[in-house]
């Protein structure tokens, strides 16, 4: 509890929201928190995000008038990110090397995201190749607490118009 507010943790979902009408498009959903609204229609996602932004603005502006121009959806619902940073780690303590996104609610556990729907297919192919390369060579990820290992992140950037790809292993 901090300054008049409390924080909690979700233990279990007993019933899906009526807004969750779609099947997940990702194999690691809902463990990964990268695209937690994917079971909602894109239209409902935009409505929900509009409410969230308006609540933040109303609170920050303390009743000051402003002109709301609305939320404008992207023409591309999936594979829209042109930059992504994936983490090296393990899915569980002392497990095999993984490369992907952090497990929802965890700063340590990493889930391999080889079918991530946020990035272009080229980037998921590179992620898979880099993961396999270091897995075969038994290269370990950097463990912050022990100050051992090497691999920290894989940064990928793709030029939308050129298709050029930057691969940066950290």
Each model region followed by its residue ranges:
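Accessory RNA-recognition modules of RNA-modification enzymes
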Residues: 1-170
